[in-house]
Amino acid sequence: MARMGLAGAAGRWWGLALGLTAFFLPGAHTQVVQVNDSMYGFIGTDVVLHCSFANPLPGVKITQVTWQKATNGSKQNVAIYNPAMGVSVLAPYRERVEFLRPSFTDGTIRLSRLELEDEGVYICEFATFPAGNRESQLNLTVMAKPTNWIEGTQAVLRAKKGKDDKVLVATCTSANGKPPSVVSWETHLKGEAEYQEIRNPNGTVTVISRYRLVPSREDHRQSLACIVNYHMDRFRESLTLNVQYEPEVTIEGFDGNWYLQRMDVKLTCKADANPPATEYHWTTLNGSLPKGVEAQNRTLFFRGPINYSMAGTYICEATNPIGTRSGQVEVNITEFPYTPSPPEHGRRAGQVPTAIIGGVVGSILLVLFVVGGIVVALCRRRHTFKGDYSTKKHVYGNGYSKAGIPQHHPPMAQNLQYPEDSDDEKKAGPLGGSSYEEEEEEEGGGGERKVGGPHPKYDEDAKRPYFTVDEAEARQDGYGDRTLGYQYDPEQLDLAENMVSQNDGSFISKKEWYV
């Protein structure tokens, strides 16, 4: 017994030593089982699970390749390849699993007609000696394409005024999908959607969406589409709403130009209703139709020529299975027809403001051009103005005082030019005026004048700072027929600092006041 216990202990130690030796053998870590980390496939399709043994050592012997599935913490054999015994596939995979290229380095299998139960973790294991077993695992996901459809409500959709209750109009379903689908709606309707997910026992999910709204006349014939997005697929299916509503009544035929003696006019009652209106009734505000007016279903005929008795408010009532609604129109009768302006006349009338604006702009430009010409002419005239000393606008100086004469007067001409018929050489008077001889002749020639002294008349005038306008005119009248002894250009005057040149050619002192 002691020997047997010793032998057992020695065997265990020997096995451990062999394992450690195999673990530390050169190249042991390079022996790798290569698989895909994850795979997926749809129900009913085939999937290939790859598995290979990389870089086996020459001294390592492969004894078996095994595929297993991890189930609830345990391993269940799926398929086995043994070089000595061949291929073995276990139930329930016997009819759906096969090795593609069984060998010491390749353990790839094909799993056909996938089922939801095939989803899980699969292990590919290579048994070697003396290195031991090498394995890797992959995750297989089985997907289920959903079945999608849309259906409208079986109830009748009716638009009723005063009712705000939302009713179910359509349901969109994406059934038995794995993973679940994403459901949405595409529409111009002003409703709201609600969603529900149902998890089925087999792992699939059914998504249901219901669309609700308050029916209205505007919702009739509107499109409502269900959109289902699943994986890389997109499903779209739509329906058209059928909303029933009361008639919406309008009356046509009155063009605003009904006049006396007009013929062949009528009114037509049009009702927008679902279902269509089946009954029409014509009345007036007075209750009865005028003489010569005849109602035929939806049309009101005016027999014979129009007269004033046919004027009034006409009412049409339309009825369908949902209800009765009415519309009205007021008919006015005029004595004479109204002739609207032809379109071409209206178009020309619209162009009148443009023509007027163009004329006004042209006139303004012409006025500006003329004013500019006048301004330019005045500026040129101002620069070339020589002065006019005979105007009444002057404050006339006496020609002798310091206040009435510029400080720097141009030099007197030494030789004055007289007409050819003049025999005597005359001496110029002060300021180039008449000579002393002429003054003496005017006084009668009896007076004597001191040689070299000023004439008494000039001496008296020199004492006056200026002449009045009347005196200036009188002096001009007295000297009107005379000519200046000489002429000069006012622009060439060297004006004193206390004198200011005026626009009219005159000079005004800055030091004296003029009244």
UniProtKB/Swiss-Prot annotation:
Residues 1-30 form the signal peptide. The chain crosses the membrane at residues 356-376. Keywords: Cell adhesion, Cell junction, Cell membrane, Cell projection, Disulfide bond, Glycoprotein, Host cell receptor for virus entry, Host-virus interaction, Immunoglobulin domain, Membrane, Phosphoprotein, Receptor, Repeat, Signal, Synapse, Transmembrane, Transmembrane helix. The modification Phosphoserine is found at S422, S434, S435, S509. It is found in: Cell membrane; Cell junction, Adherens junction; Presynaptic cell membrane. One of its GO terms (molecular function) is cell adhesion mediator activity. It holds the Pfam family Ig_3. Residues 446-464 have a biased composition (Basic and acidic residues). The modification Phosphotyrosine is found at Y436. Glycans are attached at N36, N72, N139, N202, N286, N297, N307, N332. InterPro entries: CD80_C2-set, Ig-like_dom, Ig-like_dom_sf, Ig-like_fold, Ig_sub, Ig_sub2, Ig_V-set, Nectin-1_Ig2. Residues 400-486 are annotated as: Disordered. One of its GO terms (biological process) is heterophilic cell-cell adhesion via plasma membrane cell adhesion molecules. It comes from the Eukaryota. GO terms for cellular component: adherens junction; cell projection; plasma membrane; presynaptic membrane. Residues 31-141 form the Ig-like V-type domain. Its main location: membrane. The keyword Phosphoprotein applies. Coiled coil: none annotated. (Microbial infection) Acts as a receptor for herpes simplex virus 1/HHV-1, herpes simplex virus 2/HHV-2, and pseudorabies virus/PRV. The Ig-like V-type domain is involved in homophilic interaction in cis, a prerequisite for cell adhesion. Ig-like C2-type 2 mediates neurite outgrowth through binding, induction of phosphorylation, and activation of FGFR. (Microbial infection) Interacts with herpes pseudorabies virus/PRV envelope glycoprotein D. This is Nectin-1. It comes from Sus scrofa. The gene is NECTIN1.
